[in-house]
């Protein structure tokens, strides 16, 4: 089955079984805005709890925070978001659709990688255990041709994104013959920048002084509160501050279900350390965070690092942990060495010292920072994509089994009375009442056959089911 068809089935399954609904659906919905249903919210909460326990509860030098969504507007001036939080956009004149120019080019580069992967897969199937991939890559003409095209395009793209050079981005799109996915034409406008922040007015006045922003990231709340947390918690470097919360970006090209939305949730940690030690901690958290993902048992081969070619204005190192979705490897978590940029900017714009006093060195300085940031919705999608499985039954029918990691399953256990007789429902309810204080437990009404009840629990990823019969 084509991966595109698999993804459509996953989206349909999410709606049918109460994981994700289109928001405001009775009013025909709102583009790229979704609600999490009764099973989706449990899965999402379990993801957040799994992360919080591993990051906050298991580390003595990491604490939590819940900062406000609205912040003083100067915060976003200091952070660079007002002036630099932009995407390069391009329109197709025929379809009237708008795209991110960088994404169009990256998707085009991925096609060269896909061609190489197909050649390797065919050769591996043909030669079996004797296949030497390194030699094949170095000698096969088709692989070499596509690798050269990829390398040449990658070099031009990297150069264009420094700045970025908008004219060069359009030139690449034209030179590569990239077409609009809707119209199939190459009738493109010029590339221009678009700021991604949502703004609104606070209070009764509606002038420039009342302008505030919906936060585009959760990190800045940690930065402006870092000194308060450090002093009240008597924290010593290195230490981390974690936060889970909503962020908002006016994505022009929101797509791929909950992967890219305008309202989304982040799980972030800012880890503060001595200047000069940030790269050591960057490498440390890269390994720790990948191990956390792999511990879920979704296949180590489905994860990879992707180092950033173009660094954000605040970073001196950055990498993504990518997961293999049905539409390719995509970022689920970012690890960034943000230097002391953010804290220094807030010190500059606020006019207040937020330096850390190091008692061992007997000096004050602005700490450096290493960030780990997960998109909760992307994590949710990666779990659903990996867990979705169709099984062929002996009678030719197909059933869906959601093989969720047990720690994340919305319902941990379902209890089924075999039928309505001999006090079996009452006994089943007693078992549910005892278990529900420990984990989410579901009672399966005996009006349906036992087979249907089991199949429904398979479809929502329940790892354990108990049948109460006359021998119980």
For every predicted segment, state its role.
Residues 1-472:
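NTP/phosphate- and nucleic-acid-binding module
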């Amino acid at each position: 089955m084509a991966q595109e068809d698999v993804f459509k089935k996953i989206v349909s399954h999410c709606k049918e079984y109460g994981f994700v609904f289109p928001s405001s659906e009775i009013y025909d919905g709102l583009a790229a805005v979704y609600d999490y249903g009764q099973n989706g919210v449990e899965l999402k909460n379990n993801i957040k709890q799994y992360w919080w326990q591993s990051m906050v509860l298991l580390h003595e030098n990491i604490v939590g925070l819940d900062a406000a969504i609205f912040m003083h507007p100067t915060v976003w001036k200091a952070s660079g978001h007002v002036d630099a939080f932009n995407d390069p956009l391009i329109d197709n004149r025929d379809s009237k659709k708008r795209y991110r120019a960088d994404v169009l080019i990256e998707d085009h580069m991925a096609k060269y990688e896909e061609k190489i992967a197909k050649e390797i897969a065919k050769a591996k199937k043909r030669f079996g255990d004797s296949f030497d991939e390194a030699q094949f890559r170095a000698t096969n003409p088709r692989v070499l041709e596509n690798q050269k095209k990829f390398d040449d395009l990658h070099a031009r793209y990297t150069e264009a994104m420094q700045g970025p050079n908008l004219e060069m981005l359009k030139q690449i799109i034209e030179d590569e013959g990239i077409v609009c996915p809707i119209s199939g034409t190459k009738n493109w406008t010029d590339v221009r920048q678009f700021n991604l922040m949502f703004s609104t007015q606070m209070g009764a006045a509606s002038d420039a002084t009342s302008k505030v922003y919906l936060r585009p990231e959760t990190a800045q709340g940690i930065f402006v509160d870092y000194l308060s947390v450090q002093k009240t918690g008597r924290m010593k470097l290195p230490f981390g501050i974690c936060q889970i919360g909503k962020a908002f970006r006016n994505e022009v090209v929101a797509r791929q279900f909950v992967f890219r939305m305008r309202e989304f949730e982040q799980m972030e940690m800012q880890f503060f350390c001595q200047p000069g030690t940030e790269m050591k901690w960057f490498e440390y958290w890269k390994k720790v965070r990948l191990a956390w993902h792999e511990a879920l048992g979704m296949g180590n081969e489905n994860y990879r690092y992707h180092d950033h070619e173009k660094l954000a204005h605040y970073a001196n190192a950055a990498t993504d942990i990518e997961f293999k979705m049905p539409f390719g490897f995509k970022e689920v978590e970012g690890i960034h060495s943000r230097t002391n940029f953010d804290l220094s900017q807030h010190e500059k714009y606020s006019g207040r010292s937020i330096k850390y006093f190091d008692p061992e060195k007997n000096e004050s300085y602005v700490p450096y920072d290493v960030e780990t940031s997960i998109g909760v919705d992307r994590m949710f999608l990666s779990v659903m994509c990996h867990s979705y499985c169709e099984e062929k039954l002996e009678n030719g029918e197909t059933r869906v089994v959601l093989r969720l990691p047990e720690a994340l399953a919305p319902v941990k256990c379902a209890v089924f009375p075999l039928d309505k007789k001999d006090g079996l429902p009452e006994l089943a309810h007693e078992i549910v009442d005892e278990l529900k204080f420990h984990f989410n437990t579901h009672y399966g009404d005996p009006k349906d056959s036992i087979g249907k009840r089991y199949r429904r629990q398979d479809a929502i990823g329940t790892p354990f089911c108990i049948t109460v019969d006359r021998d119980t």
